[in-house]
Amino acid sequence: MESSKKEKILARIESRIRDIKKTNFAYDEVAYATNVGYVDRQFKNITQQDIKQHGTNWVVMNEISEKWNPLIGGSFENKIQLQIIGFTQALQESDNLGTIINSLQKDIMLAMLKDVELDNLCSYLMPVSTHAVENMIYPYGGFVMYYDITYVTQGFEI
């Protein structure tokens, strides 16, 4: 059975995030500044123990909602709201946790905006908002980013 269009989109985003490595280029000759060690999907109720277990630069993707709108001619437009949570840690006491968080956040943004049509799987994706994860205990830190991903589907191509 072939995967749904939504699943292909989410798998492509997951692949992009997994490719964030210092040895890979975000675009042209701009290399990523971080290495993403672990990517997970639909991980709820994250605990401090989960963060410690998965190590540095752990990224979680959660589907938040979908909104369907009919289009003329029988097509439908679907807007998926995707939550991306990034966790990292300062490995040395002298490391600036804010700088480490910003670096991972930037790399995820570069990976997402590299091709806003995700190899023609969607019409576009757009960053919506970002905020810090509250109640983190040093040396751990995190952020939450939200993206809207819009695609059009017709007939059985759901």
Predicted regions and their residues:
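Extracellular/virion structural assembly segments
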Residues: 75-79, 87-110
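Conserved short hydrophobic interaction patches
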Residues: 16, 20, 107, 111-118
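Glycine-rich, aromatic-bearing surface loops/beta-hairpins
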Residues: 118, 122-157
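Generic short beta-strand segments
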Residues: 63-67, 87, 130, 148-150
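Small/polar-rich, solvent-exposed N-terminal microdomains that initiate assembly or binding
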Residues: 1-74
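Residue-level signal for secondary-structure boundary sites
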Residues: 68-69, 90-94, 153-157
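Oligomerization/assembly interface segments of phage tail-like spikes and tubes
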Residues: 74-91, 140-153
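Exposed beta-sheet edge/beta-hairpin loop segments within beta-rich domains
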Residues: 69-75, 134-139
